Amino acid sequence: MKYSIDDLIFSKDIDEDLYCQLCCNLMNESVSCPNGHCLCKGCFHKQIETVKSECPICCIPVTIQTLCKNIYLQKHINNLKVYCPNSFLNNDNNKLILDEKKGCKEILTIEQLKNGKHLKECKFTFVSCEYNEKCGKYRMNEIENHQDQCNYYPTKCFYCKNDFERMNLSNHLLLDCPLVIIGCRYKDGGCNETFPRHELSKHLALEDNHQQYISNIINGHQSLLKSTSKQLKQLRSSCEELETKLINNDYSFNGRWIIKQFSAHFDLFKENPFTNLIISPPIFLTPTKEFSLSLSADTVVNSVNCISVILSKQFQSSSTIKFSFEITNQSQTKSIKKEEKKKFSHLIGSSHSIEFPTSEIYNIHNKFIVNDQLIIKFNIKILSIQDEQQEIEESEENFNNTLITELEE
């Protein structure tokens, strides 16, 4: 903590004559010229050695040898009251902040502060943790409380008697200590023996490799897996039932897709339409019903170049979905909105699109692209979901029929 005597002054009503006219601080070891003008000893010496050998106040010629100590003035200064430096918070700022709750309450004279006796005995001095500097600094009267909780405090293992940092002792006992009493790793299979950790290998060798216990554990895991699978199936069924109820209650999603730096995205897309697709962040209607939007600029419909806004379904069940896209214009009355209702297959990635004429969107006078960003408002509403397993079975059956027909031909 950095401070000057001026920072610690208890009373602010101090005679201006006690301040040095060069450094503007309280005079430290005041000395005077033959005419009686006083400055700090250090300031007067610096004036003579680096500026000019004269008093900066009356301009009388002086040398270091002709300067006189002003004992009376210095005694008056030394009797001024100051705070103990440990009255303040230990902060990294240049400004001292009085710590009224935990700081030292002692008021000293400047002379008492300079002789250092109080500072050597003060219980409010800041000290570093002796076990690790990362802990920071604490007042001397609080350091014991810190050490009772310090993660780096050396703690002796009850079993092996070695010292460990407090934060590492638990792991030592749990994983490493050779003298800790442990149970057999095949306890779940029926082996209830206990022994010091360092005898584990010996125990395993004497028990015919614990084959029967291992078999018991495997059987237990298989039984648990079967039970867990049954519970998971029930949870999935409940989840699907809840989602169906949500959808039947007009569950839908409204949002906006803002494509910033649109021109840069579009240039990358033109370089490689397959790897540089413009794709939205994921959209979740429910925790398991995910969608995404993407933009394609190379679609041709009836000989007209179009921008396609594509809705992709990222979950595995057939769905009938009503969706709309609105490419917004700076003038709301000129925004273009289109709507579709489509059936999406059970496959993940099943998609449908809506097209918008490129010439209208890219015409700068039409003001669809403003500040190099394109905004697309969208609405997605799931109207119905077909049973997932039924849809997959129907799909597999149709696929097998197609293969058979091709083989017959």
From Swiss-Prot:
Positions of TRAF-type zinc fingers: 75-145, 145-201
Function: Probable adapter protein and signal transducer that links members of the tumor necrosis factor receptor family to different signaling pathways by association with the receptor cytoplasmic domain and kinases.
Matching InterPro entries: TRAF-like, Znf_RING, Znf_RING/FYVE/PHD, Znf_TRAF
Family according to the record: Belongs to the TNF receptor-associated factor family. A subfamily.
Domain notes: The MATH/TRAF domain binds to receptor cytoplasmic domains.
Domain MATH residues, every copy: 252-380
Annotated coiled-coil segments of the chain: 221-250
Compartments where found: Cytoplasm
GO annotation, cellular component aspect: cytoplasm
Keywords: Coiled coil, Cytoplasm, Metal-binding, Repeat, Zinc, Zinc-finger
One Pfam family here: zf-TRAF
ZnF endpoints (RING-type): 20-59
Provenance organism: Dictyostelium discoideum (Social amoeba)
Top-level division of the source organism's lineage: Eukaryota
Name of the protein this chain belongs to: TNF receptor-associated factor family protein DDB_G0273435/DDB_G0273505
GO molecular function: zinc ion binding
